[in-house]
């Protein structure tokens, strides 16, 4: 290493410290080789191709400023003092790596953009084909509990429109989202307008179908209505009619059975006995 420094010291001349902007044809050596660090004024003669041309900084008015630079060969000195030429084409071109990287990145993006079969199966139920036409599947309806419906109905009777803070408070107290509360009030208002338009019962007299506390069953008739029309006060005649009807039914209830020369009579209340056949008299 000492030999290298000895050979470099004499190469420094006063002319090397000239103004770098005086030579319009000179350019910075770091622009020629992307692999070498920026060289100083002491390295310009050490890395010069011909040994006598000194490189300075690039002038803004230079004709070579901004032009593509060709590959060059620069000298290097070993430890033993021998020098040689290093070709810039001995290393692979950086553009080939860049092209290969972009090709691989494009292929990777195309592979990632294609959804997997499992993801495609998950997204397909959102659209269903009905009669050859796509139809969007509706989300399942929200099932409200009895407590939630009762609270919503009471609030709707007080006011049909809720402000944003009131809606947020009601949703938090019932364990619902603000969207669910808003949709319930919208549906309730639509039903109410439809009832009013059809000329049905007024809202205050029409029981709500969504209110579990409302009694929607028909009213039971009064106790005195179930007894039927009042009968005229003919009690003696009614008693006689009932007695005659009972006797007629008793006669019809008697069954005559005959077996040989005997008759078996079954009388109401179910007593079975036999009677002897008398002289033309039947008991």
From Swiss-Prot:
Q: Which residues bind DNA?
A: 137-196
Report the principal subcellular site.
nucleus
Q: Where is this region: Disordered?
A: 15-47, 198-237
Subcellular location(s) of the protein: Nucleus
An annotated GO cellular component of this protein is:
nucleus
Q: Where is the composition biased (Polar residues)?
A: 19-45, 206-220
Task: Name the keywords, alphabetized.
Answer: Developmental protein, DNA-binding, Homeobox, Nucleus
By its UniProt entry, which PROSITE patterns does this protein fall under?
Answer: HOMEOBOX_1, HOMEOBOX_2
Q: Which terms does the UniProt entry file under GO BP?
A: cartilage development; cell differentiation; embryonic skeletal system development; embryonic viscerocranium morphogenesis; fin morphogenesis; medial fin morphogenesis; neural tube formation; olfactory nerve formation
Q: Name one GO molecular function term.
A: RNA polymerase II cis-regulatory region sequence-specific DNA binding
Q: Which family does it belong to?
A: Belongs to the distal-less homeobox family.
**This protein's name:** Homeobox protein Dlx5a
**Name of the gene this protein is made from:** dlx5a
